[in-house]
Design a protein with these regions (language model features):
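Conserved phosphate/oxyanion-binding catalytic-loop motifs
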Residues: 78
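C-terminal helical cap(s) of enzyme catalytic domains, especially alpha/beta-barrels
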Residues: 110-119
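Short, well-ordered alpha-helices that flank and scaffold nucleotide-derived cofactor binding pockets
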Residues: 70, 93, 117
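Glycine-rich phosphate-binding active-site loops on the catalytic face of alpha/beta enzymes
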Residues: 53, 89-111, 149-152
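Conserved N-terminal beta1-alpha1 strand-loop-helix module at the mouth
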Residues: 1-74, 82-86, 121-126, 130-150
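Short, glycine-/small-residue-rich phosphate/pyrophosphate-handling segment
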Residues: 106, 118, 127
């Protein structure tokens, strides 16, 4: 049976939680406290989007994701800045229950089988904005992806 969940989103940019992927207005300087607030207010999950631009920013974001995972009693889903299998590993080791592959990026589609076999289908999620990717990559999604996230 398909199930819909209330998933709160945190967009990390330069150490803060910002409004969304395009608007970097700061909504919280303490993303872990924001995540705890969401958890205490009936979120089924928290999705964290790492918007870092450099390796140093990415490592700092992973430290924040660790704090978020510790602050939450619900699963944390890690997304953003995935370029290779190592990035999925880092998200999972930071405490994320699952990691997201962005199906708007060919490089993420190309590593689907590899990361699913390495970490297990249950740990891998795909995000998409264009529904045509669902039919275009149907077999890959069914075999190697546990969940889908529609980004709109």
């Amino acid at each position: 049976m398909n199930k819909k969940l209330f998933c709160a989103s945190i967009y990390l940019y330069q150490g803060s939680a910002v409004r969304n992927l395009e608007d970097h207005t700061i909504v919280s300087d303490d993303p872990a406290a924001l995540a705890a607030y969401y958890c205490n207010n009936n979120a089924d999950r928290v999705i964290v989007f790492d918007q870092s631009n450099t390796d140093d920013e990415h490592e700092a974001a992973l430290d924040i994701i660790k704090k978020i995972a510790l602050a939450c009693e619900v699963p944390v889903i890690g997304a953003g800045n995935v370029k290779r299998m190592e990035d999925i590993k880092k998200l999972l080791y930071a405490g994320c229950a699952k990691a997201v592959l962005n199906y708007s990026k060919l490089s993420n589609i190309e590593i689907t089988e590899e990361v699913s076999k390495k970490f297990g289908k249950s740990k891998i999620v795909a995000s998409y904005t264009d529904t045509s990717c669902l039919s275009e990559h149907k077999e890959l999604l069914e075999e190697y992806i546990s969940e889908l996230i529609c980004m709109n």
